[in-house]
Regions:
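Non-catalytic, usually N-terminal nucleic-acid engagement modules in DNA/RNA processing proteins
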Residues: 1-12
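Extended two-metal-dependent nuclease catalytic cores across DNA- and RNA-processing enzymes
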Residues: 12-201
Length: 202
């Protein structure tokens, strides 16, 4: 939200319109979280200003690049296998050889991408409606105010993706969206906090 105030801003609007008792739900969630900490052998990570996908993105990279987590199979040492259980397409950018993603909705593994840079460029142009990130042709408040977004036609976006040349009039919005979507752009202080929480959790 420091970068884009409307980021996931629809959540509050949706909660306000919902009949769910959110205070009670949050109380139950906190109770379950504490029970996981107290009684189960799972690491529970909670860091201010962090979304779940930030935690997954940072820790996937950290564990993959840290030899302390490597596994030994005879004489062969390899990276710790990681399985991400989520249907969120943002995790497809975590295209490490040791990482797989299982979609609960599709009941199967999500196909790997062959070009992460191309994936991120297209996502930055198209935006991510579920996260309140509008496409680069639409107003910043399109999603939070439920305004119709301008259409992005394949004939318009194909040359940009093919030549990877971003028109000047959308560069600023592409850059903003990329910062919101790309795990490599998570601020260092947040990444460090996630790793510290991971190392300190039992």
């Amino acid at each position: 939200k420091d970068i884009f105030p409307n980021y996931k801003g629809h959540r509050k609007n949706d909660r306000d319109k919902s009949k769910i008792d959110w205070d009670k739900l949050f109380t139950i969630t906190n109770t379950i979280k504490q029970e996981l900490i107290d009684h189960f052998p799972f690491k529970v990570i909670e860091v201010p200003k962090c979304e779940c996908d930030d935690v997954v993105g940072v820790l996937t990279k950290y564990i993959t690049n840290n030899p302390d987590y490597n596994v030994q199979d005879g004489l062969i040492e390899s990276n710790q296998p990681i399985l991400i259980c989520s249907s969120d397409n943002d995790f497809r950018q975590l295209n490490y050889p040791n990482v797989q993603q299982f979609s609960v909705h599709q009941k199967g593994m999500i196909e790997r991408v062959t070009d992460v840079e191309l994936l991120l460029l297209e996502k930055s142009i198209r935006g991510e409606a579920s996260d309140g990130i509008p496409n680069v042709l639409s107003d910043d408040d399109s999603l939070i105010n439920k305004k119709r977004q301008k259409s992005i036609y394949q004939t318009w976006i194909d040359p940009i993706l093919e030549f990877r040349t971003i028109p000047n009039d959308i560069k600023e919005k592409v850059e903003r969206n990329r910062t919101l979507i790309d795990f490599e752009r998570i601020p260092k202080e947040i990444s460090d906090s996630i790793i510290q929480s991971f190392l300190e959790s039992k």
